[in-house]
């Protein structure tokens, strides 16, 4: 049964149906768009390295980087590469692995039905051989080495490694050359069978499409496939300390000038649904009010020459981990880290209702503009859905957040023992 969900304020109607095999399908028709985006996502990412495989009773520990490895391998079939099928059908295809999910997507202005069929079928039909797995190790090994030479990537993961002692978020998404050497065809099938069941997946389509036609096409496609019900996936719950693992780290690299990131580790990252949405948006308003371009703090850091246009801040919230990262290129990494840390610790007195109001207007404006991008909607929708939130509730919740809500977030989140600094400095 197709269920329309109305979002009157945004004038959007979302169509949803849960297939008999458990697959959630969502369609967002956009009349004025010429491009259609479809994203097929599994709730399986780099942090899912300890779990009970389908049909077994014991927890296993799989090699780091296997989710990303599997993403690469799914595109390869006995008779060639799926990327070529998409391009013959006038579509551009892509995929990515994050900490918590793996997504496969295409965008096209024509042949939407054929491309959608190709997307669903290739993801639901794995083909792994020992030979192709061995070959892929070399390719992904090169990718890993490339990231190892990227100072911004090393800085970002450096700050995460500083924060987390036990949680697998501290492991690079692609793993290491050593860890992927242990990946086998059988391990890939074991991960695939466990995490790529339709009941652990979501298909989202946005564009100038007819929701009834799309959903019945998916229904027909899924009806032909012999899926059986699957028990809930058991993942290991990691015990992680509240305080950061390391207060500071310096990485020497071939860079022109230093880079610095201050990390703030979330205290209680086990929120979902409306509670998480309110928390995340309150945190975003706080960071915008504290460090946005129109803030006194930004001006002071800029005038001292500590920051330039690379300065950025963001807050990542998932189930089981969460953190803010603030910084950029700087000639004075120590002073910048000290200033950012002290601004965070003084946030309670630096924030006013007026500053929150300005931040709110900016955030709502940016969000409404982003809703004109099918790519943005497609990539964000699933993340929200997997955390029991809705992308289309963002404006409503932003409008409701008060100064008191932001002060509560400051009380909960900001403490000296949850702050850490990572620096990348030139080899001298």
UniProtKB/Swiss-Prot annotation:
Keywords: Hydrolase, Metal-binding, Metalloprotease, Protease, Zinc. GO terms for molecular function: metal ion binding; metallopeptidase activity. InterPro entries: Metalloenz_LuxS/M16 (IPR011249), MPP/UQCRC_Complex (IPR050361), Pept_M16_N (IPR011765), Peptidase_M16_C (IPR007863). It is an enzyme of class 3 (hydrolase). GO terms for biological process: proteolysis. Zn(2+) binds at residues 68, 72, 143. Its EC number is 3.4.24.-. Its cofactor is Zn(2+). It holds the Pfam family Peptidase_M16_C. Binds 1 zinc ion per subunit. The active site is at 71 (proton acceptor). Belongs to the peptidase M16 family. This is Uncharacterized zinc protease YmfH. The lineage of its organism: Bacteria, Bacillati, Bacillota, Bacilli, Bacillales.
